[in-house]
Amino acid sequence: MFNQFGDLERCALRPGNMHSADGWDSILKPVVARYRGKVSRIHFRADAGFANPEVYEYLEGEGIKCAIRLPANRVLQERIGDLLTRSVGRPPNEARRSFANFTYQAGRWTKPRRVIAKVEWLAGELYPRVGFIVTNMARPAENVVAFHNKRGTCEQWIKEGKGAVKWTRLPCRSFAADAVRLQLHALATMSGISCARWRRPSRSRTGR
């Protein structure tokens, strides 16, 4: 888990057969507790691995605004059926994006929630790209999607960690040893980030 500045807040090694949302509380709750009372607002964005009603209820209970990717299903696609039909004529030469807002309640949810759909027709493609986000934000749909899309920067930080510090190089014979090794990799990552910031000239010194 990263914050908006690229700081690695928390990481954990888990078995390959474990769902990505399992154990979410051991990752998310300590980070929220660390920031509670120190910042005025906390926002959370995540991929579909955190699409879990327990996560939603925890964030809502803590007053945290969130935008979480929601896996597509037949019911969601039926709600935006009119946006999934391609216009008659030649495919567009430029991307066309449409947004939809609606309330939705999955079987395990205790209440309906706001869902935003983004439908994108790209030049040269026969079928649209569709994404769903569940959110408790009151922002316009385009703004919520833009906020969630910044999660892609986090993916880049993960790639950098894999390339520079070899996060995924865990050759130990035991799971526990590899878990410790991952934490050492995380510490090395944050040490590198801190050194880079200390070396970066301030605006006052550069005159900018």
Where are each of the predicted segments found?
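Electropositive, glycine- and tryptophan-enriched low-complexity nucleic-acid-binding patches
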Residues: 1-38
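An anionic, glycine-rich sequence signature occurring as long contiguous blocks
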Residues: 65-166
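A short acidic (Asp/Glu
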Residues: 52-57, 77-81
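Short, surface-exposed basic-aromatic patches at helix termini and helix-loop junctions that form
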Residues: 56-65
